[in-house]
Curated annotation (Swiss-Prot):
HAMAP family: HslU. It comes from the Bacteria. GO terms for biological process: protein unfolding; proteolysis involved in protein catabolic process. Belongs to the ClpX chaperone family. HslU subfamily. Disulfide bonds: none annotated. This is ATP-dependent protease ATPase subunit HslU. It comes from Pasteurella multocida (strain Pm70). NCBIfam families: hslU, PRK05201.1. A double ring-shaped homohexamer of HslV is capped on each side by a ring-shaped HslU homohexamer. The assembly of the HslU/HslV complex is dependent on binding of ATP. It is found in: Cytoplasm. GO terms for cellular component: HslUV protease complex. ATP binds at residues 18, 60-65, 256, 321, 393. GO terms for molecular function: ATP binding; ATP hydrolysis activity; peptidase activity; proteasome-activating activity. Its main location: cytoplasm.
Amino acid sequence: MSEMTPREIVSELDQHIIGQADAKRAVAIALRNRWRRMQLQEPLRHEVTPKNILMIGPTGVGKTEIARRLAKLANAPFIKVEATKFTEVGYVGKEVDSIIRDLTDSAMKLVRQTEIEKNRFRAEEAAEDRILDALLPPAKNQWGQVETTDSNNTTRQVFRKKLREGQLDDKEIDIDVAAPSMGVEIMAPPGMEEMTNQLQSMFQNLSSGQTKKRKMKIKDALKTLIDDEAAKLINPEDLKQKAIDAVEQNGIVFIDEIDKICKKGEYSGADVSREGVQRDLLPLVEGTTVSTKHGMVKTDHILFIASGAFQVARPSDLIPELQGRLPIRVELSALSAVDFERILTEPNASLTEQYKALMATEGVNIEFTGESIKKIAEAAFRVNEKTENIGARRLHTVMERLMDKISFNASDMQGQVVRIDEAYVMDALGDVVENEDLSRFIL
């Protein structure tokens, strides 16, 4: 669980997302409140429920990116889902309970990785011993018992030192590794997901404990054996309980495109399913118990963050009960030409840095002038105004158009320096930006 302060969280998000200060603050406070709640004593801790968030803003302004970056910062079970993928009970499609099942699976991976890291030192020693046994099979007496001598120990220590220094990395050895579990995909009708999970677990258990001899380089064998040995040191039941606790206390669910399941007054028929999805979401958001293959999971303290463009529907089109369970509303503003300019240069791994690095692999040095950045930003902004406003995603289209000629010829331009200035941008984009018909089809 992250112990970062709200200011630190916002500062970290600022490195990747331009603007949208209100949304960053709301998310940062919500994440910090998870930590604050865990510091409380039990009777009060149970009463403090998370304040769920509804992010409202046009497409391409950073809603989903905030969720992606939050997942990395949270160090907690996190899942992002599309509201449109779900249907109400009785319709063909995924049920909303699968959100919690997927979140629990995510928590299992997170907790397993944490436990493996805790046991890594012991696992490394055991893995080294197995590799040394393969390199130097221990001598046995006439009764088949392993004999240890000073010379054997000395040789073993010499090889252990070489192994740790990487001198044996490219040598190949035969080792016994755990056989991969049987991957059985079972299609099930709605409402039968739990039964299919149990069947899949049964098939996986059939192959568990089996080993397979493989020929591998020592470098790769060491990684495989460390994971294998670490898995032996982990108690599966403890792992399940820790994963369930992590989901119940620190889990975060990000529901994107929630505006697409709003009921619109002028439609009927299929919209019944849309409202049904909202009603199915209610128990999850309010607090219920969901059965998963790892155990029963309570959703009372899971944080839900919903987002939507709400260009056709409005937040008030959500059913009142769901509106009441998303008390914090945050509006994200549309991006300006100045924002586009900052997006091109300020974030870590900005678009311009990405293209420079890609072309550098071919030995081509790309230079962007300040004026060219400004013109690219203006071009993207103008196309958004003339056609559909898709926010910062327009920059990807514009940059691909701008870099098209260089990307195609880069392999023949090794050692050259290409300076992208205002004239270059106008030459590449000018006609397309000015002609609205071309903009619609090309940009």
